Amino acid sequence: LDRDGTIIEDYEDELWRNKTEPIFLVGSIEALEKIKQKGYEIIILTNQYLIDEKIISIEQYQDFTDKFIKRIKDNGIEILDVFYCPHSRESNCSCMKPKEGLVKKSLEKYPEIDLKDCFIVGDSLCDVELGKRLGIKTFGIGVGKKEGEVIIIDSLGDVASYI
């Protein structure tokens, strides 16, 4: 799953400088719970180019992520892991979505995961493109177009009826 704009509020880049607490989108906690109840593990894949572009520090990112995970855990939901790309948009790294580096890292750490049993949910074209590249079920929150394995939804809450 993507994080910003999918599970929590997203902001214009500069506004992230002053954000210290995650604001969860309406219904996102309940949606995570339904995904877990259906037997799925939850892995977060997030582009965090704001780190390399000096808008936020790695410490700010980690503090924010710790609060994000704690809030979810306080609701009885376990997140298996969070993988992030800290590189700038100009870096041409292999881990920034839609490239597959974050997925490869997650599969290296969790070799028992079979990609064909996975799905991707995100609110940006890079999330949809990643899912298409991987050939897995992909949910675009208000983005993309229905083709192949891509399903357009209004929010994370809509995913449970498709999985």
Give the residues covered by each predicted segment.
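Active-site neighborhood of HAD-like aspartate-dependent phosphohydrolases
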Residues: 1-43
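Asp-based, Mg2+/Mn2+-dependent phosphohydrolase catalytic module
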Residues: 3, 59, 63-80, 90-120, ...
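Ser/Thr-centric signal marking residues that sit
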Residues: 6, 46, 138
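Conserved protein kinase catalytic core
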Residues: 8-10, 53, 129, 161
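Histidine-centered beta-alpha loop that forms part of the nucleotide-sugar donor binding/catalytic region
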Residues: 10, 47, 143-144
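A short acidic, helix-capping loop that chelates divalent metal ions and anchors anionic groups
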Residues: 15-17, 51-55, 88-93, 147-148
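Substrate-recognition element of Asp-dependent hydrolases with the DxDx(T/V) motif
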Residues: 28, 32-65, 81-88, 131
